[in-house]
């Protein structure tokens, strides 16, 4: 990496050692520039890896004494043939009026670092030995075990899936193949002989596990849905005809081989359905205690052959017996207590205390021990799955970040009972609606990709949004003669046009050009004037979004109206700053002149008015200043730009028919909206601990997404699985635990395994 000096205002990039690069599931390259600690950098015994430190400083101030904000940039993926790439970022900061100049626009150019190759996950012989072995026999497994090798089992983590998808993408790109299914399902063994070994790089799992994972990901027949009665009958006939030839049976039914194998294993002609009778429950308890040599009242969660139990019970399948026992009957007989909200919070805290990097490392048996309200370790894990779904993007964040987000979410709910009451009531329009949530990311495209828009470098910022649909009949109509968009009251902090925009310096100090996807330029001038005007025509797009952040001080201490008048479909985002943000302008007005005519819109627009705001809204813990001055510049320089957003909510009326709202929206829409905005427990977190550092927005799921109580009954939804890797269970002869519904082939499934042996 080198220093770039094109202009006098170009920021110098100093390299301590190297830059951290990772890739997400979308194949985007993530560049992380962490905050530097001078003492840590100069310390000889620092344990921080050198590739996680990067210093950014301006040319006129080479010191790193001042705090430098952490920056996470997501760029387009690198081609394997690229020797270098360029990242150009346009950024603005809050500065005093006399300091506002073109120098506030920062341009950073970063070259590809040769040390990237040294950061390959293939650095250890142990990982390579495991990921290059098929493990189709017990001897293969024992051989590597005796050599001291260990490997990961159980559920796949987000990081592992990211590595796998990235490896597949690179393999396809290197060979000019567009779809991985061509390799997986169409190529011969010889043609794809290096495929699985290549995509297993960096994964501490055997090739057989990678093979099974890839098949389930790419085989559309594995996600067909519930078996119909007709399919069940056909499956029985095919099983008699073809035996254990699961591939042939699956092809005849249009389903995957693993799917039909699992269904056959659970299929019995004598199974009852519906509620269990007292006689069935009694029989189940007797059989379990008899087979495990335990007494009634003893807790039994492991070492049970559910196939043997089902055979002895006679009227239920092994899945039904297992679910009934682990979810209810064993807990009831042992005198267990009901699960409460306090237990839910306690579970989060206990998992946090474990300090594990991946949830697959949790010992659920140990965690459930002595917990009277926990019905079984398996039940506790399923409860955890329910809890983590409170975070809408839980699949996209690392486990430590997820835990921290859940802790903060429950802390916010605990400290804001009024918000919880409002969310659960019928007066909030978004209490049962679906949301569209994305990460907070800065996506930076290469210069050559933006030539059609502008020859100058620019950055496209994508904002995460939570959408609530509002009917046009619920708001009073505005004047049909209005052709402007006016937002009065509060401090104007941001203005965005989605789905994307480009911010380009115009050459005039303090003035930037908002370049939209429709190639319409909207010059934006940052001044101390109470009015900030966007000249020229606003884009006549139904996806136009105005972002207006209202000052918490203003919302809590004034009764002025907030009026929105426009002829385009209404999409308004209201945001509230975090506790470290002060009010830069006491009063601001945004006016956008439009070319649109009222004749283009047959229906009149709405006006959203709020005369007062509820007194019970808790005052944010923040220092409010009436105006911005030079004394506060340091406050802004210390903050990560993504932390300026505390809550984001978008309200539209175009897709009301698609919502699942069961109640009538309140008449005072604005009051309800502002209450929701002020207390939305959206969390922005900057990760520093791992190589996969990135800035992440954790967004709580809508209130209606997760039921307050599970209402677990006889037919629980607990998945049929165990706490060990199902792929290797058939090798463990000493275990009587039945595998999961994802069960691996047993020894007689010769066709499934023999195909694998010949792949290498």
From Swiss-Prot:
Q: Where is this region: Disordered?
A: 24-63, 593-614, 738-760
Annotated segments matching region Required for transcriptional activation? 87-170, 459-760
Annotated stretches, region: Interaction with CCND2:
1-237
A Pfam match is: Myb_DNA-binding
Which BP terms in the Gene Ontology apply to this protein? positive regulation of transcription by RNA polymerase II; regulation of transcription by RNA polymerase II
Q: How is it modified after translation?
A: Phosphorylated by the cyclin-D2/CDK4, cyclin-D3/CDK4 and cyclin-D2/CDK6 complexes and to a lesser extent by the cyclin-D1/CDK4 complex.
Q: Where is this region: Interaction with CCND1, CCND2 and CCND3?
A: 176-690
- Region ranges (Required for DNA-binding): 87-458
Q: Which GO terms describe its cellular component?
A: nucleus
Q: Tell me if Cytoplasm is a UniProt keyword of this record.
A: no
Report biased composition (Acidic residues) as residue ranges: 37-47
Q: Which InterPro entries match?
A: DMTF1_DNA-bind_reg, DMTF1_N, Homeodomain-like_sf, Myb_dom, SANT/Myb
HTH myb-type domain location is 268-333
Tell me the ranges covered by the Myb-like domain, including all copies: 225-263, 339-388
The GO molecular function terms of this record are: DNA-binding transcription activator activity, RNA polymerase II-specific; DNA-binding transcription factor activity, RNA polymerase II-specific; RNA polymerase II cis-regulatory region sequence-specific DNA binding
- Which domain of life, per UniProt? Eukaryota
Q: Which residues bind DNA?
A: 306-329
Q: Does the keyword section mention Repeat?
A: yes
Give the family from UniProt.
Belongs to the DMTF1 family.
Q: What does this protein do?
A: Transcriptional activator which activates the CDKN2A/ARF locus in response to Ras-Raf signaling, thereby promoting p53/TP53-dependent growth arrest. Binds to the consensus sequence 5'-CCCG[GT]ATGT-3'.
Q: How does it assemble?
A: Interacts with the D-type cyclins CCND1, CCND2 and CCND3. Interaction with D-type cyclins may modulate transcriptional activation by this protein.
UniProt protein name: Cyclin-D-binding Myb-like transcription factor 1
Species the sequence originates in: Rattus norvegicus (Rat)
Supply the gene name. Answer: Dmtf1
């Amino acid at each position: 990496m080198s220093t770039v000096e094109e202009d006098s205002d170009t920021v110098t990039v100093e390299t301590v050692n190297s830059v951290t690069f990772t890739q997400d599931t979308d194949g985007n390259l993530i560049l992380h520039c962490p905050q530097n600690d001078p003492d840590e950098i100069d310390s000889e015994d620092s344990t921080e890896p050198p590739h996680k430190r990067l210093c950014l400083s301006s040319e006129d101030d080479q010191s790193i004494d001042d705090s430098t904000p952490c920056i996470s940039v997501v760029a387009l993926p690198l081609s394997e043939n690229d020797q270098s790439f360029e990242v150009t970022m346009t950024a603005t900061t809050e500065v005093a009026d006399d300091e506002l100049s073109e120098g506030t626009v920062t341009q950073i150019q970063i070259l590809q670092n040769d040390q990237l190759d040294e950061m390959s996950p293939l650095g250890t012989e142990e990982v390579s030995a495991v990921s290059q072995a098929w493990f189709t026999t017990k001897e293969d497994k024992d051989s590597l075990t005796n050599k001291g090798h260990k490997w990961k089992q159980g559920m796949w983590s987000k990081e592992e899936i990211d590595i796998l998808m990235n490896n597949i993408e690179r393999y396809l790109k290197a060979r000019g193949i567009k779809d991985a299914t061509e390799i997986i399902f169409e190529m011969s063994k010889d043609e794809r002989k290096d495929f699985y070994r290549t995509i297993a790089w960096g994964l501490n799992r055997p090739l057989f596990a990678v093979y099974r994972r890839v098949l389930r990901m790419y085989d559309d027949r594995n996600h067909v849905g519930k078996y119909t009665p007709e399919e069940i009958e056909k499956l029985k006939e095919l099983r008699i005809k073809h035996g254990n030839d699961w591939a042939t049976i699956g092809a005849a039914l249009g389903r995957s081989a693993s799917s039909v194998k699992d269904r056959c294993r659970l299929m019995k002609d004598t199974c009852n359905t519906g509620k269990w009778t007292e006689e069935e429950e009694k029989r189940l308890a007797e059989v379990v205690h008899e087979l495990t040599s335990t007494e009634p009242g003893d807790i039994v969660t492991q070492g049970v052959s559910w196939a043997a139990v089902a055979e002895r019970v006679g009227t239920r399948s092994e899945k039904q017996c297992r679910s009934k026992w682990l979810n209810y009957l064993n807990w009831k007989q042992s005198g267990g207590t009901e699960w409460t909200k306090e237990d839910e919070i306690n579970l989060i805290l206990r998992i946090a205390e474990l300090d594990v990097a991946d949830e697959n490392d949790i010992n659920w048996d140990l965690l459930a021990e002595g917990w009277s309200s926990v019905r079984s370790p398996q039940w506790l894990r399923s409860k955890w799955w329910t809890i983590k779904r409170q975070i809408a993007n839980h699949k996209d964040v690392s486990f430590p970040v997820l835990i921290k987000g859940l802790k903060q979410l429950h802390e916010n709910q605990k400290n804001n009972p009024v918000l919880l009451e409002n969310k659960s009531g019928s007066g909030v329009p978004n209490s049962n609606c679906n949301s569209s949530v994305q990460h907070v990311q800065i996506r930076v495209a290469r210069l050559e990709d933006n030539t059609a828009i502008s020859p100058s470098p620019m950055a496209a910022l994508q904002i995460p949004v939570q959408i609530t649909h509002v009917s046009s009949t619920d708001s009073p109509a505005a004047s049909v003669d209005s052709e402007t968009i006016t937002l009065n009251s509060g401090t104007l902090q941001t203005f965005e046009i989605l789905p994307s925009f480009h911010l380009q310096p115009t050459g005039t100090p303090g003035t930037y050009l908002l370049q939209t996807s429709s190639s319409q330029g909207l010059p934006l001038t940052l001044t101390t004037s109470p009015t900030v005007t966007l000249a020229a025509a606003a884009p006549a797009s139904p996806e136009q979004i105005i972002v207006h952040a209202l000052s918490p001080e203003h919302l809590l201490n004034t009764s002025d109206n907030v009026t929105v008048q426009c002829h385009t479909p209404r999409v308004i985002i209201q945001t509230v700053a975090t506790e470290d943000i002060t009010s830069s302008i006491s009063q601001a007005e945004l006016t956008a002149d439009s070319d649109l005519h009222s004749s283009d819109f047959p229906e009149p627009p709405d006006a959203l008015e709020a005369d007062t705001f509820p007194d019970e809204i808790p005052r944010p813990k923040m220092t409010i200043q009436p105006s911005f001055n030079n004394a506060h510049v340091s406050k802004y320089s210390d903050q990560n730009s993504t932390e300026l957003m505390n809550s984001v909510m978008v309200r539209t009326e175009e897709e009301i028919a698609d919502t699942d709202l069961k109640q009538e929206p309140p008449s005072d829409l604005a009051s309800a909206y502002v209450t929701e905005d002020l207390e939305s427990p959206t969390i922005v977190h900057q990760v520093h601990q791992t190589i996969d550092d990135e800035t992440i927005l954790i967004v709580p799921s809508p209130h209606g997404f997760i039921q307050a109580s599970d209402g677990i009954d006889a037919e629980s939804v607990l998945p049929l699985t165990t706490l060990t890797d199902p792929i290797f269970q058939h090798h463990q002869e000493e275990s009587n635990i039945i595998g999961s519904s994802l069960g691996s082939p047993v020894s007689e499934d010769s066709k499934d395994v023999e195909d694998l042996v010949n792949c290498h």
